[in-house]
Design a protein with these regions (language model features):
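A conserved mid-protein helix/loop that constitutes part of the nucleotide-sugar donor-binding site
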Residues: 19, 23, 219, 223-242, ...
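Short His-centered aromatic/hydrophobic patch
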Residues: 87-92, 109
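Membrane-proximal helix-turn-helix segments that form the acceptor-binding/catalytic region
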Residues: 129-172
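Carbohydrate-associated surface elements
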Residues: 179, 198
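Nucleotide-activated donor-binding/catalytic signature segment of Leloir-type glycosyltransferases, i.e.
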Residues: 262-281
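Short hydrophobic beta-strand element within catalytic cores of glycosyltransferases
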Residues: 316-319
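Conserved acidic donor-binding segment of nucleotide-sugar-dependent glycosyltransferases
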Residues: 331-342, 350-356
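A short, well-ordered alpha-helix in the C-terminal region of glycosyltransferases
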Residues: 357-371, 380-383
């Protein structure tokens, strides 16, 4: 099949959604399909054997309309030659679904954009139960300039309504987890297929085994991600303090909570090594060496790429049980799940202090990762593309 993958985010500068799209592209190519990536992300014109068409991105006011138009025009050019257009994110999806005619159109939903204007389901630092009118007014408080606030809620309502209407036009909708699928099933969009992200354990092991470029402690607990409230940055040091591992915390990431974390660490006597954002290769090398990966996320995680790659490397994981995380990790088999900060600290303590726990989780993680391999998932993607699923 000739498959066009459309996405706003893609390597080399990308988070989990971009790298997951790359993994899908390479796996489809490896299965013999003709794959082209169309993206507004900056970078080169190929990703391994997969050609990449880079479009001019945009920011600022009216970004949604302009980006949707950019994708629509680009996809209209490839539509005649493609068997499938598979959109990977909100704006690429809106562009693909605005085509008047074309090939089969599939949309993957990787976060909460169809049900939450901000795509996070977080408001004022806490989980938002639903986008009711009252909750919307609370949500915009402090987020937008005062002069724009009266228009915000009507616009948010229109935005969510139009996204739902667009999704209903898709030939197939994929959710990356059952947690996301449950949200989508509250909308009138038809059937939703749950298809998780792909991880190629052979590739991540090869990268992780390459020579290190970061200078890291001999033994450490690792955090990877944005230092933001929804990622649990405020709970990192309290969890480490509760765990009493005696190990330093390595933070590969940055964000608005950076200074708070450093102050907490100083107060608690926790040694922190924070080189900031790291290339994916350095992240994988650090994962392979870490005594444990701590994952304190407080928002409803759709399906974390960090956790997927940690599983593939057999890294022992201590994670907060939010969103789709329990769909990746079976408690006490492929990782340890926690419900609060003290529980997370206890999980870290068990991993670091008990070699038998660490050994069991390493084996369970590597075994669990096989469920997300290209060989396990590509046939299911092909069935969706053919319309037989």
């Amino acid at each position: 099949m000739k498959i066009a993958l459309a996405t706003e985010v893609f390597p080399p500068k990308a988070g989990g959604a971009g790298w997951s799209t790359r993994a899908l592209a390479l796996a489809l190519k490896g299965a013999g399909h003709e794959v082209t990536v169309i993206t507004t992300a900056e970078g080169g014109n190929s990703e391994g054997p997969v050609p990449v068409v880079r479009l001019a991105g945009t920011s600022g006011p009216f970004r949604r309309g302009r980006m949707t138009g950019t994708f629509r025009r680009a996809l209209n050019e490839v539509a005649a030659g493609a068997d499938v257009i598979h959109a990977q994110h909100s704006l690429s999806a809106l562009g693909a679904l605005s085509l008047k005619k074309g090939p089969r159109t599939v949309v993957t939903v990787r976060d909460h954009w169809p049900v939450c204007f901000w795509s996070t389901r977080m408001s004022q630092g806490a989980l938002c139960p639903q986008c009711s009118t009252a909750n919307m007014w609370r949500c915009v408080d402090g987020r937008l300039p005062a002069f724009s606030t009266p228009l915000a809620v009507p616009y948010m309502k229109w935005d969510l309504r139009s996204k739902g209407q667009a999704l209903a036009r898709a030939d197939a909708v994929i959710a990356v987890s059952e947690a996301i699928a449950r949200e989508l099933r509250t909308l009138a969009i038809g059937a939703v297929e749950v298809l998780p992200n792909i991880v190629d354990a052979v590739e991540v092991e090869r990268i992780a085994a390459s020579p290190a470029t970061l200078s890291l402690p001999d033994r450490f607990v690792l955090f990877v991600g944005k230092l933001e409230a929804n990622k649990g940055a405020r709970d990192l040091v309290p969890a480490m303090a509760h765990a009493k591992t005696g190990l330093p915390l390595v933070v590969l990431g940055s964000g608005s909570e950076d200074m708070r974390l450093r102050a907490q660490a100083t107060k608690e006597g926790i040694e922190v090594h924070s080189p900031g954002w790291a290339d994916r290769e350095d992240v994988l090398r650090a994962m392979k060496r870490a005594e444990a990966l701590v994952f304190p996320s407080t928002w409803p995680e759709p399906l974390s790429r960090v956790l997927l790659e940690a599983l593939a490397l057999g890294t022992p994981i201590a994670a907060m049980d939010t969103g789709g995380t329990s769909e990746l990790i079976e408690h006490d088999v492929s990782g340890l799940l926690a419900t609060d900060v003290s529980d997370l600290g206890e999980a870290l303590s068990r991993i670091v202090h008990d070699p038998s726990v660490r050994s069991r989780l390493k084996e369970g993680a590597a075994s669990r990762a096989r469920a997300f391999s290209p060989s396990a998932l590509i046939p299911r993607y092909e069935a969706v593309y053919r319309g037989s699923k």
